[in-house]
């Protein structure tokens, strides 16, 4: 259940000048990503600005992207919430239109204890038992870490198939890998940690950089998996400045600016996020030119 491949793109959400969702550009971008190294599209996650999207906008994006990539790639719906009831309702609605999985972030702001986190994810999984669920641990944003012990317990639930581990803690990821079944999938939540996490048993990455270098990420992962570690390391080190530059300010501000530099009409970020300033744009332009991305 839930084979999502190795390169999952955390897709941005394009907006029009009036601030409404640009579904046409979303479809065009989705098709381009699938043609350039993306196995699965993660729609309405952090990079997709889910905190400032309405549930209706999210649902419409799921429909648009599903129709665009039908038969070519999988779609994971970001339906997370710090309300268990809302997360269940959104996930059930997404499941009915045929998404291939759901990404569920650790509930933010209200900081539930580990018992509450377990009950939250268990309830969502049980409400949609046929839908693969990917946990999403990003304590820097949520204020609460999903402990390895809780992940291990959750991995016993049939349709909880993996975790996007964005704590930045390699020891934590290692503990999860050590204590969970081999079929439980670990995905890097930071592009710069993809190769280190592959070395301790991760399957791939939920990537921001794959908007720009999806094929190169595929090459890096394939090289590592075939024993060509030096080749994989060379690709990682070549791309590392890009990985770092895409996070010099709050994601998705830099990646949206990078796409604009390539000519994509992705629009602004929604408030309270702000657009990239001149310094960020100049740094992006320099690293992208060095990699022949513009």
Swiss-Prot record:
Pfam family, one: DHDPS
Catalyzed reactions: L-aspartate 4-semialdehyde + pyruvate = (2S,4S)-4-hydroxy-2,3,4,5-tetrahydrodipicolinate + H2O + H(+)
SUPFAM superfamilies per the UniProt record, alphabetical: Aldolase
Subcellular location: Cytoplasm
Chain positions recorded as pyruvate binding sites: 47, 206
InterPro entries: Aldolase_TIM, DapA, DapA-like, Schiff_base-form_aldolases_AS
E.C. code: 4.3.3.7
Pathway(s): Amino-acid biosynthesis; L-lysine biosynthesis via DAP pathway; (S)-tetrahydrodipicolinate from L-aspartate: step 3/4
Coiled coil region boundaries: none
GO terms under biological process: diaminopimelate biosynthetic process; lysine biosynthetic process via diaminopimelate
PROSITE patterns associated with the record: DHDPS_2 (PS00666)
GO molecular-function terms, A-Z: 4-hydroxy-tetrahydrodipicolinate synthase activity
Site note Part of a proton relay during catalysis, residues: 46, 109
A Gene Ontology cellular-component term: cytosol
Residues of the active site: 136, 164
Keywords: Amino-acid biosynthesis, Cytoplasm, Diaminopimelate biosynthesis, Lyase, Lysine biosynthesis, Schiff base
Enzyme kind, highest EC tier: lyase
Similarity comment: Belongs to the DapA family.
Primary role: Catalyzes the condensation of (S)-aspartate-beta-semialdehyde [(S)-ASA] and pyruvate to 4-hydroxy-tetrahydrodipicolinate (HTPA).
Assembly description: Homotetramer; dimer of dimers.
Descriptive protein name: 4-hydroxy-tetrahydrodipicolinate synthase
Protein source organism: Nostoc sp. (strain PCC 7120 / SAG 25.82 / UTEX 2576)
Gene field: dapA
